[in-house]
């Protein structure tokens, strides 16, 4: 492309300080360096993680910053050493990477890349410790190596999944974080059998993606657990057959579920990050074969307490990160699941706004309205 090797000026939504509305600014985006790729972002979605680090409550504030990590785009140019991507390729940026060289990447059992595992505090490129974004010469920090709230961004090649160019980017962009996290937690980690009973704790976008995985796996009974009764109607679209609100019961919700299911559910997936829900997720599974999977990120001082007999009675507890998907290796196949109409993404996309109104997406999420709001960056 004619822009290769040159600085590109484009629009970006900049977070200047914690909790303040993003500002649409003209930024300069430098060319990609070794093992980097400059991507033209076409569609980007808002994830709760963006909101969490925008609010910057309880973490190191890194500002000014360009947030965003769920997106779909097209390769504009590549840096030295990049051989697997060329200009024009369609890609999904991912907040965590796959270098393909470390012990984790070489293991079939892990997706926790040593080099490119998520780093929320870095704010610069891993190669030279510099930002590729500037405004009037002043550096603007990156976010989790992606910074997709910009018309152009620079990303390490290991954090880009090359996908089918026929796949609509305004739909599959939501697969680059939350939906894959929930879907994979069920399909790759819990692995429910056809006809089994599955409980999903937390019915936000990630929990509903986990529920979609249970539906795809052929679970015959899918129990949604949430403190908001309004979530049940929406969850029915994802295969939910029963709904339990812990506030409606005097006994612990795990006891309610055990009674409902004649001894416990076959699989349970937790998508809340609340420690009580995590414990309940484990304690509600059936002895002998029950598997519980933890997805949510708890408070750093939270402590998981359960009786050791739960383990001795052959209940299994697992954790997962990004649904155990290796970004570059596995995400292209998740896109194909959508293309084959096995996976329905449209029902996750509840809102769409122009890039100039990106703050509306933040307002919707803060109010708990909708699941995913898509923004088209050229609007």
Curated annotation (Swiss-Prot):
Protein family (similarity comment): Belongs to the zinc-containing alcohol dehydrogenase family.
UniProt GO molecular function: alcohol dehydrogenase (NAD+) activity; S-(hydroxymethyl)glutathione dehydrogenase [NAD(P)+] activity; zinc ion binding
Residues given in the record as Zn(2+) 1 binding sites: 47, 49, 69, 177
PANTHER family to which the protein is assigned, alphabetical: ALCOHOL DEHYDROGENASE, ALCOHOL DEHYDROGENASE ADH3D
Protein name: Alcohol dehydrogenase 3
Cofactor names: Zn(2+)
Disulphide linkage map: none
Localization annotation: Cytoplasm
Organism phylogeny: Eukaryota, Viridiplantae, Streptophyta, Embryophyta, Tracheophyta
Free-text remark on how the cofactor is bound: Binds 2 Zn(2+) ions per subunit.
Keyword Transmembrane helix annotated: no
Reactions mediated catalytically: a primary alcohol + NAD(+) = an aldehyde + NADH + H(+); a secondary alcohol + NAD(+) = a ketone + NADH + H(+)
Binding site for NAD(+): 49, 202-207, 226, 231, 272, 295-297, 322, 372
EC code(s) of this entry: 1.1.1.1
Quaternary structure, from the entry: Homodimer.
Binding site for an alcohol: 49, 69
Keywords from the named record: Cytoplasm, Metal-binding, NAD, Oxidoreductase, Zinc
Gene Ontology biological process terms, A to Z: formaldehyde catabolic process
Gene Ontology CC, one term: cytosol
One Pfam family this sequence matches: ADH_N
